[in-house]
Amino acid sequence: MTADRWAGRTVLVTGALGFIGSHFVRQLDARGAEVLALYRTERPEIQAELAALNRVRLVRTELRDESDVRGAFKYLAPSIDTVVHCAAMDGNAQFKLERSAEILDSNQRTISNLLNCVRDFGVGEVVVMSSSELYSASPTVAAREEDDFRRSMRYTDNGYVLSKTYGEILARLHREQFGTNVFLVRPGNVYGPGDGFDCSRGRVIPSMLAKADAGEEIEIWGDGSQTRSFVHVADLVRASLRLLETGKYPEMNVAGAEQVSILELAGMVMAVLGRPERIRLDPSRPVGAPSRLLDLSRMSEVIDFDPQPLRAGLEETARWYRLHKR
């Protein structure tokens, strides 16, 4: 479908001031949608930028509070065509380890409140940003969408993974019991302009960029052999909207085709910044799964564009960081 699928439609985006949510807001506004941008945490610069867009209305909402969510939907719902759910408590491996209870509690309450309101207020469709961390890791076999916890349910005390698993199960049950038109997107590691560069909590790419740009060595948790698939945030947004446009699959992996080790990634980051390689391994720190290889067959069928190569995406992200760092 063409961009006019979104022109004149009203789309509610949660986590609208966050990294992924703000990119959805910008792209939807550019494509002619009326955007209801829900947020909880103040981010003044992004807030001012989005408020200046022609078709964006910012609404502060505590998604963990059922009455607050219902109040927002009651006020906004008569015109909502689509919900894009990006809000989630997230962070790097250390953050997830230390705050698992808080993450699980926050994320499961948020998705429960949201899906109940989508049902009760008759919203036409919802896409949920899930996670590829749901899959059991294999260094050689790419995870297909049907290879998730339904095939291999396993115990974990990782509150983030548990919250995403709960969210997917609840979404499926809403689809089956209430007929909710819900889509689940499972991204690889998302990166790009606008990400948070807090090294104590941030994702791997912004953390590496911040340290390398400051002339510090990059610390890699583990031996650096763990591999990941990365996806530029703009590609994630475009692929998710294409999934809604086509309605082709209920779940879809979204990632770039390149699978790189964390050690290779560190070298790429140093190179795009023009820094000499200064890398230190710390085997005592948590590393997550050794591999997270994703099958992208569904994504290849759905999208109508070529995802950005990792090197080009890193160069763009590095330029953005150097312009906006403090």
Swiss-Prot record:
<dbReference type="InterPro" id="IPR036291">
    <property type="entry name" value="NAD(P)-bd_dom_sf"/>
</dbReference>
<dbReference type="InterPro" id="IPR001509">
    <property type="entry name" value="Epimerase_deHydtase"/>
</dbReference>
<protein>
    <recommendedName>
        <fullName>dTDP-4-dehydro-6-deoxy-D-allose reductase</fullName>
        <ecNumber>1.1.1.364</ecNumber>
    </recommendedName>
</protein>
<keyword id="KW-0045">Antibiotic biosynthesis</keyword>
<feature type="site" description="Lowers pKa of active site Tyr">
    <location>
        <position position="164"/>
    </location>
</feature>
<comment type="function">
    <text>Cannot directly reduce dTDP-4-dehydro-6-deoxyglucose, and thus acts after the epimerization step catalyzed by GerF.</text>
</comment>
<dbReference type="GO" id="GO:0017000">
    <property type="term" value="P:antibiotic biosynthetic process"/>
</dbReference>
<feature type="binding site">
    <location>
        <begin position="15"/>
        <end position="21"/>
    </location>
    <ligand>
        <name>NAD(+)</name>
    </ligand>
</feature>
<feature type="active site" description="Proton donor/acceptor">
    <location>
        <position position="160"/>
    </location>
</feature>
<keyword id="KW-0520">NAD</keyword>
<keyword id="KW-0560">Oxidoreductase</keyword>
<dbReference type="GO" id="GO:0016491">
    <property type="term" value="F:oxidoreductase activity"/>
</dbReference>
<feature type="binding site">
    <location>
        <position position="164"/>
    </location>
    <ligand>
        <name>NAD(+)</name>
    </ligand>
</feature>
<feature type="binding site">
    <location>
        <begin position="129"/>
        <end position="132"/>
    </location>
    <ligand>
        <name>NAD(+)</name>
    </ligand>
</feature>
<keyword id="KW-0119">Carbohydrate metabolism</keyword>
<feature type="binding site">
    <location>
        <begin position="187"/>
        <end position="190"/>
    </location>
    <ligand>
        <name>NAD(+)</name>
    </ligand>
</feature>
<comment type="similarity">
    <text>Belongs to the NAD(P)-dependent epimerase/dehydratase family.</text>
</comment>
<dbReference type="Pfam" id="PF01370">
    <property type="entry name" value="Epimerase"/>
</dbReference>
